[in-house]
Amino acid sequence: MGRAAPHRRATETGAAGCVQVTGSWPLTESAWWASTTTGTTWMQEITPLIQSGGDLTSVLTQPNWDRVPWLEEHRAQVLNLEQRPSPRLFATHFHCDMMPQSFFKDKPKVIYIMRNPRDVFTSSYHYYGMASFLVNPQSQDNFLQKFLSGKVMFGSWFDHVKGWLNAKDQDRVMYISYEEMIWDLRDSVARIALFMDSSLTPKVVEKIADHCMFKNMKQNKMSNYSLVPSEFMDQTKSEFLRKGVVGDWKNQLTVAQAELFDAVYRDKMKDVKYKFVWN
């Protein structure tokens, strides 16, 4: 549950051109970032609720792209973000080395979500097919080649994950997987709250987890992108919040495609020591 917004300038390989615009943003040590290749829509729902102590007002009245703005999206330049009270919430798809200078200076905390790249591919394939502002994915074979070689928006999944896993000051980075959140959302919310130094009662944690269940978020027009005109996102082709499950790649990839994916994955990730839940 995390993809590019329609008002973002999308390219095939990434958004490096936006970095300079954001490079001078004033941040604070208490600013929060959800930096991910997937699951940002989820974090745009969860983190404001943790911050508000479970008050649903913001997530029911404010679109998620204004509630937790995208660093790489031009709308962030007109929201007067520096005037928001600290801690401020941001989301981004940037690679670690693409972050603005103020990020490395002020050292805000980072919540980094990872997901089985096979499911990331599956989700991306459907998303590219419904978003008019992205390059048409064409055949699944064609899109798979692009995905594995990093010729998609925001570049290589492999480089993105490895870059953030090697980030400095890892005590300020929380690594969590989409799978963990699917399997036990209440525990995930509690862990995220602890990382954000927010003291929540079990009742509030339960309330947040219930609201942020996929089936409930799918009904929230402030989070399901139904506010976006169909000329940009045609949700008759594929819903923005599509399935919210683990392992849908098994219904998408052919045997040959899965074998190719596995071979590339083994080669690209052979030196990574982090234990992924999907391995």
Where are the regions a protein language model picked out?
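Generic structural signal for individual residues within well-ordered alpha-helical segments
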Residues: 121, 144, 182, 189-190, ...
